[in-house]
Amino acid sequence: MSPATRRNFLRGSLAAAAATAAPAQTAAPDQSIVKPAAALPMRVSVMAYSFHGLLEQGRMDIFGFLETCKYRYHLETADLWNGFLKSTDEAYLKTIRNEIDERELIVPNLAVDQAHVWADDPVQREKQHQNALAHLNAGRILGARFVRMDAGQCGKNTREWTSEAFDHIVKRYREYAQYAYDHGFKTGAEVHWGPESYWPSMQKLSRAVNHPGFGVCCHISGFQGTKEEVDIADREIAPWVVHTHIDWDVCNGQLVEKLNNLRSAGYQGYYSVEHHSAKDEYAEVAIQLAKVRAVLQSWRTGGTGVDSNHEERS
């Protein structure tokens, strides 16, 4: 090909390319590449306690948990438990926060044990209070949206608090809630143990605290009582719920009904699974996550949440 012919060929090729590209500069965006709502991230998470067996065996630490959430389960969340935290030292917590941010993870919850508000022994009560303050600060550093701290119980009474204990619990939760509110998150109790798991007591507590920085983590179907009483409690607590823990039995039972309670109340938090057996944790958690995801995906595509091939078990 002569130089003149080559120049003419190149001019023709460039003109054709420009003509092809020109419409793309003025045409409306191709809506086919916009991510549809059904493909957006689901509000799903897994509670770190689900891997306490691996933790105790030295086979997982906090950083391994973050990797597991992001890359094994393809989550955008990490539901933390202070059993995985070696300390509340700020430098250590900031290292964890850096790893959270590196993976672009959201922390919907930090569950804190050994910081329950009431203990009959005043010395122990103060020790737990200081631990609560340290973990509220941890929640702030880690970017948690909710920090769960239990209320505690009086002696062996699992249904009601004494007047002294109740007044103290309400006072402390209001203090904690104000700190949380000032720093952009919430804190509160969980349907977990003691009077927290007795609906009349938990309802009384939620109404008494009455603070915008206070909320409740609902360990679904964790209430005391008959099945009918538990079902009623799960429905009635929904307006106060800001986080959830969904165990194996719920995932394999009334999952759709229980999640519908929250959906009907306008729940905006995350649906977090929790596993307890300390055995085959990777596989068991995957099963629970799949069941919760299936319900949410059904809702997002106009379904009822119930797989037509597998009716929900009561």
Located regions from the model:
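Histidine-acidic metal/acid-base catalytic patches
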Residues: 2-74, 196-314
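Active-site acidic/histidine proton-transfer and metal-coordination neighborhood
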Residues: 13-19, 25-39, 67, 99-109, ...
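Conserved beta-strand positions in the central sheet of alpha/beta enzyme cores
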Residues: 77-79, 109, 148, 245, ...
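Short catalytic-loop micro-motif centered on adjacent basic/acidic residues
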Residues: 78-80, 187-191, 218, 244-246
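Glycine-rich, proline-tolerant flexible connector loops at the mouths of alpha/beta enzymes
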Residues: 79-97, 154-157
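Positions that flank functional sites
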Residues: 84-85, 115, 154, 195, ...
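Metal-dependent catalytic neighborhoods of phosphoester/phosphodiester hydrolases
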Residues: 88-94, 121-125, 282-285
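Catalytic-core regions built around general acid/base machinery
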Residues: 92-102, 172-179, 233-236, 258-262
